[in-house]
Each structure stands twice: as structure tokens, then as C-alpha cells.
Amino acid sequence: TCNDDSFLDDAAKAGDSRWVHRPRIDWERAERRRIRGTPEQRIFEGLKHLIAVRKTTSAFADFNNRELIDVENPHLFALLRTHPALQGDSVLVVANFDVNAQFLDLEGLSKRGYFRLGQVQDLATGLSSALSNGQLEIPPGRFYWLTEHRALAGF
């Protein structure tokens, strides 16, 4: 449920608009997360996966290590997370807020030392993408947690 304005009927909550995003939980619907193939199950499993990835990615540790990145595209929001002690461990979080695919130009980041190998990996999906002329296509409404893909030597 989005934007539940029933909080306005409670005098103790009416002055605090944060309650608009805190609707009552429909526990029957929540239980559907256990039924394979339901939207509730797919969302629940997806969130569990993202939490697991965050827990194993040191750049996501809370060191107040967020840097907003101007990618010169008004439809894309980007921020860089870098572990302060492990400078090579960085994640570029990029989200496309447009209804059309957008292109992320990583050439500027390459000049700053990021994504020089020409291939990036999305930590959220595990998929790697080769860059074409320093451009990466971001589908509409999608986000990526990008890190530089490093092939293991000898494998």
C-alpha cells in the first residue's frame, strides 16, 4: 500500500507526514511471501538477495562514504561508495528514473581511476556488461550496483 493517509484520522500522528509511508500491515498478504511464484514471494526473495549482497560488499559499510556523482544525465541518479581503507573496493550505484533507456557515460569515471578495465559487473544481478565506447545502457526504472569486473588471473 502506498500513501496511506489514514494516519490523518489519529490526532497523535496527524502532524507527522512520515506515517503516510507506514500503512498497517496486511498479514494475510504478507504470508503470501511463502508461496512460490507470487509477487510477494518474488519481492521478498529479491530483497533478501540485495541484503545478502550488501552484507558481503565492504564498500556498503557505513563509513559516511557516499559521493554523489554528476553523470550529466538528468534521468540518472548516481553515487559512489568506496571503502575508506580499501580504495579499490568501490560500488557505483546508478538508477534510471526515466521511462526510456538511458546511457551512462563512464569515461569521466575512467579518468578518475574507476572502470578502466572496460567491463563492469552489477552486484545486484551478478551479470557483467562490456562497455561500448564507455557507455552502459540502463533500462527504464532499473538500478545497478556497478563494480569493476576483475578477471581472476589463471582462470
Locate the predicted segments by residue.
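Short, surface-exposed, polar/charged, turn-prone segments marking secondary-structure boundaries
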Residues: 29-31, 120-123, 148-150
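Loop/helix patches that line or flank the sugar-binding groove of alpha-linked glycan CAZymes
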Residues: 1-114, 138
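C-terminal beta-strand-rich structural cap/linker in extracellular carbohydrate-active enzymes
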Residues: 130-155
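Solvent-exposed beta-hairpin/edge-strand motifs
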Residues: 108-126
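Generic detector of short alpha-helix boundary/capping microenvironments
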Residues: 38, 129-130
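Generic hydrophobic-segment detector
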Residues: 86, 116, 130-132
